[in-house]
């Protein structure tokens, strides 16, 4: 290859040598050939790299760049040695620029056409050392080659990150340290799962323990939230405490709320060791009732021993509703609080009403029976109509109920004691007098008729008059 490359400039320069054959010597021709040698040696590697260059304009630009040097040689008289050295340097600069342009075209084609982007990297790296070896004496020329090399490295490293992230991850041949950077955070998550699971178990256990101890101390969820707000400055609602006990809060909020509740629980148990000491929420504020007014804290459920319960049962059988002094006496005898004894009697009376509703009712007259027609009718003397007697359970007096303007129904009345005057009789309704029991068969009107015989009713005035001939009892005829 060296001989062929050396022959090319000899043929090219033979035309000007034949034109000025007499003025040139053979040493000068040999010197010109040697000076053009590096240029030809530098062009041959470019011709070798032409298969990698997709653009067909590369060789044409080389020929155009070589033509001015070829035309300028035969134009003037025989140039001196300094002029030839300058021309060879200019040719080297032009070839260096051509190489830089070809490298940039290759890089652009790698970005736009070739997807992998790493198959053309070895030829480009192989091309640059040859260009540097062919020019050992020139300083500006290596700078031209280093600049494309740096840009090539930058483009090759940035191309997989920007345009092809999926191919860069799947291809094991690429050795880019930036491609494996997003993967380590995924590996950090699994070690945190055992710790999170243990924390969840601990939170669940604490929530159950907190609820049991809170109920044992007699605090409500609202009391806990308000007490924490007054004591520690973190006010929580009843819903928040309820969701914490039910494990319905987020993991972050559960972890944030746990130390506060644990601190409050320890303080509450410490303060409630002695029953005389107030609870933590009472130290900070008066507890609120349902209507928002100051009230009292819910008391603990009182457990009554068996022997005390038997004594209370005996007292209840003797007197179901003792007075305040009797309750105080019973409390002193049983060494109990007066309020506890009073509440027990109230609850016991309610229980007795549920068990025996009839025995607990007061002794009152039985309610009235439904109306039933008498088998006999009483016909007044004036013939105004028939008035059957009815039986009512009110008291000594009986009333007359009129079903119509002329006919009324009355049932016989059972009275505890009846007089002749019919004491306590109701006022007349539409000039209808009260009803009194009749005498048995005589004119004596002081005793009621125990046989339930027919009564005599006077319609003329308030006081009835009983006498023979006023009433004619007649049997009921349907």
Swiss-Prot record:
GO terms for cellular component: nucleus. One of its GO terms (biological process) is regulation of transcription by RNA polymerase II. Residues 297-356 bind DNA. Residues 1-82, 167-199, 275-298, 357-391, 409-478 are annotated as: Disordered. Predominantly expressed in B-cells. Keywords: Activator, DNA-binding, Homeobox, Nucleus, Transcription, Transcription regulation. Pfam families: Homeodomain, Pou. One of its GO terms (molecular function) is transcription cis-regulatory region binding. Residues 389-410 are annotated as: Leucine-zipper. Residues 195-269 form the POU-specific domain. Residues 12-37 have a biased composition (Basic and acidic residues). The keyword DNA-binding applies. The keyword DNA-binding applies. It is found in: Nucleus. Transactivation activity is enhanced by transcriptional coactivator POU2AF1. Residues 416-425 have a biased composition (Gly residues). It comes from the Eukaryota. Its main location: nucleus. Residues 38-60, 275-285 have a biased composition (Polar residues). Interacts with NR3C1, AR and PGR. Interacts with POU2AF1; the interaction increases POU2F2 transactivation activity. Transcription factor that specifically binds to the octamer motif (5'-ATTTGCAT-3'). Regulates IL6 expression in B cells with POU2AF1. Regulates transcription in a number of tissues in addition to activating immunoglobulin gene expression. Modulates transcription transactivation by NR3C1, AR and PGR. Belongs to the POU transcription factor family. Class-2 subfamily. This is POU domain, class 2, transcription factor 2.
């Amino acid at each position: 290859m060296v001989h062929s490359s050396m022959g090319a400039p000899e043929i090219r320069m033979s035309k000007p040598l034949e034109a000025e054959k007499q003025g040139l010597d053979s040493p000068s021709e040999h010197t010109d050939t040697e000076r053009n040698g590096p240029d030809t040696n530098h062009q041959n590697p470019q011709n070798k790299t032409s298969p990698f260059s997709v653009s067909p304009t590369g060789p044409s630009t080389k020929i155009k760049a070589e033509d001015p040097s070829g035309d300028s040689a035969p134009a003037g008289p025989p140039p001196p040695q300094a002029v030839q050295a300058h021309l060879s340097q200019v040719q080297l600069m032009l070839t260096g620029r051509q190489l830089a342009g070809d490298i940039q075209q290759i890089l652009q084609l790698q970005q736009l056409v070739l997807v992998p982007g790493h198959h053309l990297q070895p030829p480009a790296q192989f091309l640059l050392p040859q260009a540097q070896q062919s020019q050992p004496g020139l300083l500006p020329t290596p700078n031209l080659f280093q600049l494309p090399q740096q840009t090539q490295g930058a483009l090759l490293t940035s191309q997989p990150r920007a345009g092809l992230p999926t191919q860069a991850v799947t291809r094991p041949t690429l050795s880019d340290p930036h491609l494996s950077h997003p993967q380590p955070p995924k590996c950090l998550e699994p070690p945190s799962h055992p710790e999170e699971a243990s924390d969840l178990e601990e939170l669940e256990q604490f929530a159950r323990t907190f609820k049991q101890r809170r109920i044992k101390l007699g605090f409500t969820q609202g009391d806990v939230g308000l007490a924490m707000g007054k004591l520690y400055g973190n006010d929580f609602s009843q819903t928040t405490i309820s969701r914490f006990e039910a494990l319905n809060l987020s993991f972050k909020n559960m972890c944030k709320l746990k130390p506060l509740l644990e601190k409050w629980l320890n303080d509450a148990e410490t303060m409630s060791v002695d029953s005389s000491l107030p609870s933590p929420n009472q130290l900070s504020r008066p507890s609120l009732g349902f209507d928002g007014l100051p009230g009292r804290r819910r008391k603990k459920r009182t457990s009554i021993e068996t022997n005390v319960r038997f004594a209370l049962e005996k007292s209840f059988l003797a007197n179901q509703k003792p007075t305040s002094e009797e309750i105080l006496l019973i409390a002193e005898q049983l060494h109990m609080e007066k309020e506890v004894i009073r509440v027990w009697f109230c609850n016991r009376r309610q229980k007795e009403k549920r068990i025996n509703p009839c025995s607990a009712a007061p002794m009152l007259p039985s309610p009235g029976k439904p109306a039933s027609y008498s088998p006999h009718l009483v016909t007044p003397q004036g013939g105004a109509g028939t008035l059957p007697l009815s039986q009512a359970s009110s008291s000594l007096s009986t009333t007359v109920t009129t079903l119509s303007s002329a006919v009324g129904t009355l049932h016989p009345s059972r009275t505890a004691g009846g007089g002749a005057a019919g004491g306590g009789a109701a006022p007349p309704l539409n000039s209808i007098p009260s009803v009194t029991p009749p005498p048995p068969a005589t004119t004596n009107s002081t005793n009621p008729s125990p046989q339930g015989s027919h009564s005599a009713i006077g319609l003329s005035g308030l006081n009835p008059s009983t006498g023979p001939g006023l009433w004619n009892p007649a049997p009921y005829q349907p």
